[in-house]
Amino acid sequence: MQATKIIDGFHLVGAIDWNSRDFHGYTLSPMGTTYNAYLVEDEKTTLFDTVKAEYKGELLCGIASVIDPKKIDYLVIQHLELDHAGALPALIEACQPEKIFTSSLGQKAMESHFHYKDWPVQVVKHGETLSLGKRTVTFYETRMLHWPDSMVSWFADEKVLISNDIFGQNIAASERFSDQIPVHTLERAMREYYANIVNPYAPQTLKAIETLVGAGVAPEFICPDHGVIFRGADQCTFAVQKYVEYAEQKPTNKVVIFYDSMWHSTEKMARVLAESFRDEGCTVKLMWCKACHHSQIMSEISDAGAVIVGSPTHNNGILPYVAGTLQYIKGLRPQNKIGGAFGSFGWSGESTKVLAEWLTGMGFDMPATPVKVKNVPTHADYEQLKTMAQTIARALKAKLAA
């Protein structure tokens, strides 16, 4: 892989994972992804982050297209997750760096991942600066974005922010800059990444942005460890504003309905609800759990105002695809949502109670009584569903107007 020049002395190195579709084992990456590392040439030439271990050869080739890897003096490891630090042992062997800089929690994570004995590790503190020669870098801890060890690196004179996982997207492309990607594609990839990885840490996101802005960080280049680089002040402002928007989790007039069904009764109910919400002027997304991955459902929920869940009763509970999706969503802590529950049953009928408990447990408002139907829905049942949709739509409109 050839390095990509960002500005004089700054190069993107790393690897493109064209085949990635299962990112971190729990979320889809339908466009693939990248593992970005950044080479900064100076009196102390420094590599920021590495790549997954299996891509170490591509990383070394990228570095070698700029300089001999043995000329690297420093390594900065901003985050120890193995898609960014997996190639660290190979880099240490190839480069023999004078020092390896990381956060205090990064040092602990490095020890527990690699069990090293004699690496030249040096801890840097929040706000600490390091001179590389002509250039100076400042480190800022960004804990829980999205690991405890996370930090970013800021070059004030060059206005370059190496942001680690923050502002990342799962995009594998020959284009390496944000202004080369259609804005709707970029924004969707950013939202999917944030919703499925960073969303539990929305308060930390807002705090980190406040801290960085307060420290005078106003980048013209944002260099994340996944996806494309944001190039230009306007592009960087776009990225920051989107993160604030995602973290604030303000509701919209969008309703997501997800469900599973055995003999189509719950599916019929879901379709009636979708049409009823549309009649109320809502934007509707109807998602069958067997056709839609849980991360796709969460991506749609991230900017929705209401989430309606359906399942038939199964062994006094709910179907496993619905249960798994709810468990996944709960861990991501969506806020400011209205909920609703529906489902069919044969004899015991507990599913709607279980669904309502899930949604209430996630802090969702529940303005409408769940609707349950014995076996196959009738016209009267459909009228109940329409009433449910009207009640939730009114509550959503009131929430948006507040």
From Swiss-Prot:
<keyword id="KW-0288">FMN</keyword>
<dbReference type="InterPro" id="IPR001279">
    <property type="entry name" value="Metallo-B-lactamas"/>
</dbReference>
<feature type="binding site">
    <location>
        <position position="79"/>
    </location>
    <ligand>
        <name>Fe cation 1</name>
    </ligand>
</feature>
<keyword id="KW-0479">Metal-binding</keyword>
<dbReference type="InterPro" id="IPR016440">
    <property type="entry name" value="Rubredoxin-O_OxRdtase"/>
</dbReference>
<comment type="similarity">
    <text>In the N-terminal section; belongs to the zinc metallo-hydrolase group 3 family.</text>
</comment>
<keyword id="KW-0813">Transport</keyword>
<feature type="binding site">
    <location>
        <position position="226"/>
    </location>
    <ligand>
        <name>Fe cation 2</name>
    </ligand>
</feature>
<feature type="binding site">
    <location>
        <position position="81"/>
    </location>
    <ligand>
        <name>Fe cation 1</name>
    </ligand>
</feature>
<feature type="binding site">
    <location>
        <position position="83"/>
    </location>
    <ligand>
        <name>Fe cation 2</name>
    </ligand>
</feature>
<comment type="function">
    <text>Catalyzes the four-electron reduction of one oxygen molecule to two water molecules.</text>
</comment>
<dbReference type="GO" id="GO:0016491">
    <property type="term" value="F:oxidoreductase activity"/>
</dbReference>
<dbReference type="Pfam" id="PF19583">
    <property type="entry name" value="ODP"/>
</dbReference>
<dbReference type="GO" id="GO:0009055">
    <property type="term" value="F:electron transfer activity"/>
</dbReference>
<keyword id="KW-0408">Iron</keyword>
<feature type="region of interest" description="Zinc metallo-hydrolase">
    <location>
        <begin position="30"/>
        <end position="216"/>
    </location>
</feature>
<feature type="binding site">
    <location>
        <position position="146"/>
    </location>
    <ligand>
        <name>Fe cation 1</name>
    </ligand>
</feature>
<feature type="binding site">
    <location>
        <position position="165"/>
    </location>
    <ligand>
        <name>Fe cation 2</name>
    </ligand>
</feature>
<dbReference type="InterPro" id="IPR029039">
    <property type="entry name" value="Flavoprotein-like_sf"/>
</dbReference>
<feature type="domain" description="Flavodoxin-like">
    <location>
        <begin position="255"/>
        <end position="393"/>
    </location>
</feature>
<keyword id="KW-0285">Flavoprotein</keyword>
<dbReference type="GO" id="GO:0046872">
    <property type="term" value="F:metal ion binding"/>
</dbReference>
<keyword id="KW-0249">Electron transport</keyword>
<dbReference type="InterPro" id="IPR008254">
    <property type="entry name" value="Flavodoxin/NO_synth"/>
</dbReference>
<dbReference type="InterPro" id="IPR036866">
    <property type="entry name" value="RibonucZ/Hydroxyglut_hydro"/>
</dbReference>
<dbReference type="GO" id="GO:0022904">
    <property type="term" value="P:respiratory electron transport chain"/>
</dbReference>
<dbReference type="InterPro" id="IPR045761">
    <property type="entry name" value="ODP_dom"/>
</dbReference>
<dbReference type="Pfam" id="PF00258">
    <property type="entry name" value="Flavodoxin_1"/>
</dbReference>
<comment type="pathway">
    <text>Energy metabolism; electron transfer.</text>
</comment>
<protein>
    <recommendedName>
        <fullName>Rubredoxin-oxygen oxidoreductase</fullName>
        <ecNumber>1.-.-.-</ecNumber>
    </recommendedName>
</protein>
<comment type="subunit">
    <text>Homodimer.</text>
</comment>
<keyword id="KW-0560">Oxidoreductase</keyword>
<dbReference type="GO" id="GO:0010181">
    <property type="term" value="F:FMN binding"/>
</dbReference>
<feature type="binding site">
    <location>
        <position position="165"/>
    </location>
    <ligand>
        <name>Fe cation 1</name>
    </ligand>
</feature>
